[in-house]
Design a protein with these regions (language model features):
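A short SAM/SAH-binding and catalytic strip from SAM-dependent methyltransferases
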Residues: 137-153
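Class I SAM-dependent methyltransferase SAM/SAH-binding core
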Residues: 65-131
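N-terminal export leaders
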Residues: 1-8
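Class I SAM-dependent methyltransferase Rossmann-like catalytic core
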Residues: 21-76
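A short glycine-rich, Lys/Arg-flanked "PGG" loop and its adjoining helix->strand segment in the class I
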Residues: 153-168
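Conserved class I S-adenosyl-L-methionine
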Residues: 168-191
Length: 191
């Protein structure tokens, strides 16, 4: 199997730029065990992700399906945050966008992505707050990387802050992963 993909979630943005993201505490997911977001390799993510990996993590069929979905949900001419991006965004080439802001862990990969109009490197496991203004994004995407987040509730809450009212946040996932960097709860799933 070469990267089955699925859609994890989709939710609308905040109720307005003045709406603050909800306060998140470690008990925000009390139904999960305390070690749910631990990893086999808790070493520095910037070192692990330093070598550029110019590969796709889902197969051609999954890429086509994801691109078609993006075409149906991302507003033409909008500003998009491509969270945890790489050298390819899977956004349809024929979808005109005002801006695609890339976030990732590898500067070489992000610089190679032709869809990104600007990008930044940040370890969300160290700092889940994104350096972007409230309500400035018409969509946010997180493609096949959610399994690496140790603070997903905090990151998702901050993405909510960035979204315009009603803007979608599309989280896609695959059965392919770097297992030592994936969180325990993800490794326990039968994907």
């Amino acid at each position: 199997d070469h990267g089955r993909a699925g859609l994890l979630g989709l939710f609308g943005g905040n109720s307005g730029p003045a709406h603050a993201a909800p306060k998140v505490t470690p008990t925000a997911l009390p139904e999960l065990p305390a070690n749910a977001f631990s990893r086999i390799d808790d070493g520095d993510d910037s070192l692990f992700f330093a070598p550029p990996r110019l590969v796709t993590h889902i197969d051609a069929g999954a890429i086509a399906a994801l691109s078609d979905f993006y075409r149906s949900i991302v507003r033409k001419g909008g500003a998009v945050l491509d969270l945890m991006s790489s050298w390819v965004s899977h956004l349809p080439e024929d979808l005109p966008l005002a801006e695609v802001i890339g976030h990732g862990m590898n500067a070489q990969e992000l610089a190679a992505n032709p869809r990104l109009t600007r990008w930044f490197v940040q370890d969300l496991n160290r700092d889940p707050r994104l350096p972007l203004p409230d309500g400035g994004c018409d969509a946010a995407l997180c493609c096949v990387s959610v399994q690496y987040l140790q603070k997903p509730v905090e990151v998702f809450g901050d993405v909510r802050r960035l979204l315009c009212p009603g803007a979608p946040f599309v989280v896609s996932f695959s059965n392919r992963t770097f297992p030592t960097k994936s969180v325990a709860v993800w490794r326990s799933l039968d994907l």
